[in-house]
Amino acid sequence: MSPTSLNTSSETAPPSSTTVCVTGAAGFIGSWLVMRLLERGYTVRATVRDPGNMKKVKHLIELPKADTNLTLWKADMTVEGSFDEAIQGCEGVFHLATSMEFDSVDPENEVIKPTIDGMLNIIKSCVQAKTVKKFIFTTSGGTVNVEEHQKPVYDETDSSDMDFINSKKMTGWMYFVSKILAEKAGMEAAKENNIDFISIIPPLVVGPFIMPTFPPSLITALSPITGNEAHYSIIKQCQYVHLDDLCEGHIFLFEYPKAEGRYICSSHDATIYDIAKLITENWPEYHIPDEFEGIDKDIPVVSFSSKKMIGMGFIFKYTLEDMVRGAIDTCREKGMLPYSTKNNKGDEKEPILNSLENNYNIQDKELFPISEEKHINGQENALLSNTQDKELLPTSEEKRVNGLESALLSKIQDKEVLPTSGVKHAKGQENALLPDIANDHTDGRI
C-alpha cells in the first residue's frame, strides 16, 4: 500500500483551523500519524528531541503540506514546561513519546519515573494552554494481558497483573509498569482538569513506514525471515494491526465527539505458524522454518477485541497479508532486507542475521538474538508491539538535498534551538528522553 494512500475510516475533514500536537513525531507511529494528519488538513506541531538533526527529521519536513501545515518543536519529557510553547493553541495532543531503557540499572529512575513525570508534565502544558480538549495516549498491549495465564480474548476492561510483572521481571517489565502507571496518572490528571483522556491500545504494529531506520516492531514481525529465534516466543500467540489502521484509529477517536477512556485497536490474531504459512505462500524466496522449537502447532490464538471501536463505526482496512507485504516491500526498498534467503539450489543461504548485519545497514546489536531466559509466556509481544516509535537501527548517512537544511531552519519554532549559526542545544538537553520503541523513544521517535 502506497504511503500516500488515504484510509477514509473517519469521514469528516477537520476545520482548517484545527491545530494538534504530536509528541514522538519522528518515530514509526508518530511520523505516519503526522503524514495522515497533514493529509486531512490539520495544522501539526511535531515535537522532537533535536529539530536540527536533519537525518532524524528529514522524512517529516519532506511530507506533502509540511511547508504550510507542519512545524517542529524541541521538547523533552524530562523537562517541566518543555512542551508549553508547542501545545499552546492546540485543540488536541497525541502523546506517543516514551522513555525506554531495557538495560537500565536503575529502571525506577531511568524508565518508570521519567515516563510518569513526562505524562504529568505534558498534561500540565495542556492545562496551561487552556485550549486542549482531547489528549490521546498511545499505550501498549502490555497494559492489558501481561499475566501468568493467557485468556482466549482480552478487552479494555482487562489489566495486566502488576504483582506478576514485579515478581517475574520479564524482559521489558519496567516498560509495562511505566505504561500502566503513566496511563493511570494521566487519566486522573486529565479528569481533574476537564480534558478528555483517550488511551489507545495497539498490539504488534506492522506495515510500510517512512522513518529512515528499521522499526523494532518489524524486527519481531519479520523474525521468521531473519531467523531471529529470540523473537519467536513474542509472536507465538500474537495480535496485529496495520500501521495505517492504527493512525487512522487515532484520528477517528480524536474526531469522535464522545470518545473517552480505553480503546483496543487490533484487527488480527495469529500464531507463529499462521505467519510462517503466510510468508511461505507469498514469498517462497525466503527460507521459513517448518517447525518452531517448543511451540505446539496446535497452539490457540489469543485475541484482542476491538469491538468497542468497531461499534463506534471504525473500519479496519487492511489484511494481515497487507501488513506483512507493506513491511517487506519497504524494508527491501530501503536496503534493510534481502530479496531472498535461498541460494540457486533453493537451500538456505548464510544466516540472514549475519547478512543483515554486514550488508543491510542494520548495525544495532539489539536486532540480533537476545537471551531467552526471561521470555515468559510470550508476553513480550505486548512490549514490542509498541516499541513502535526506538531508534535502534541507524542507516548509512543519507545524501542531503540542496536547500533542505534551510527549509528546516525556517520551520523550527524554538528560537533558543536554532540561531542562524545552527542548532544551539539548551543546557542539559543532551540527556533528553530517548526519542515510542517504537517507540520516540526506542522505535525511532525523538
UniProtKB/Swiss-Prot annotation:
<dbReference type="GO" id="GO:0047890">
    <property type="term" value="F:flavanone 4-reductase activity"/>
</dbReference>
<protein>
    <recommendedName>
        <fullName>Dihydroflavonol 4-reductase</fullName>
        <ecNumber>1.1.1.219</ecNumber>
        <ecNumber>1.1.1.234</ecNumber>
    </recommendedName>
</protein>
<comment type="pathway">
    <text>Pigment biosynthesis; anthocyanin biosynthesis.</text>
</comment>
<dbReference type="Pfam" id="PF01370">
    <property type="entry name" value="Epimerase"/>
</dbReference>
<dbReference type="InterPro" id="IPR050425">
    <property type="entry name" value="NAD(P)_dehydrat-like"/>
</dbReference>
<comment type="function">
    <text>Bifunctional enzyme involved in flavonoid metabolism.</text>
</comment>
<feature type="region of interest" description="Disordered">
    <location>
        <begin position="421"/>
        <end position="446"/>
    </location>
</feature>
<dbReference type="InterPro" id="IPR001509">
    <property type="entry name" value="Epimerase_deHydtase"/>
</dbReference>
<dbReference type="InterPro" id="IPR036291">
    <property type="entry name" value="NAD(P)-bd_dom_sf"/>
</dbReference>
<keyword id="KW-0521">NADP</keyword>
<comment type="similarity">
    <text>Belongs to the NAD(P)-dependent epimerase/dehydratase family. Dihydroflavonol-4-reductase subfamily.</text>
</comment>
<feature type="binding site">
    <location>
        <position position="175"/>
    </location>
    <ligand>
        <name>NADP(+)</name>
    </ligand>
</feature>
<keyword id="KW-0560">Oxidoreductase</keyword>
<dbReference type="GO" id="GO:0009718">
    <property type="term" value="P:anthocyanin-containing compound biosynthetic process"/>
</dbReference>
<keyword id="KW-0284">Flavonoid biosynthesis</keyword>
<dbReference type="GO" id="GO:0045552">
    <property type="term" value="F:dihydrokaempferol 4-reductase activity"/>
</dbReference>
<feature type="binding site">
    <location>
        <position position="56"/>
    </location>
    <ligand>
        <name>NADP(+)</name>
    </ligand>
</feature>
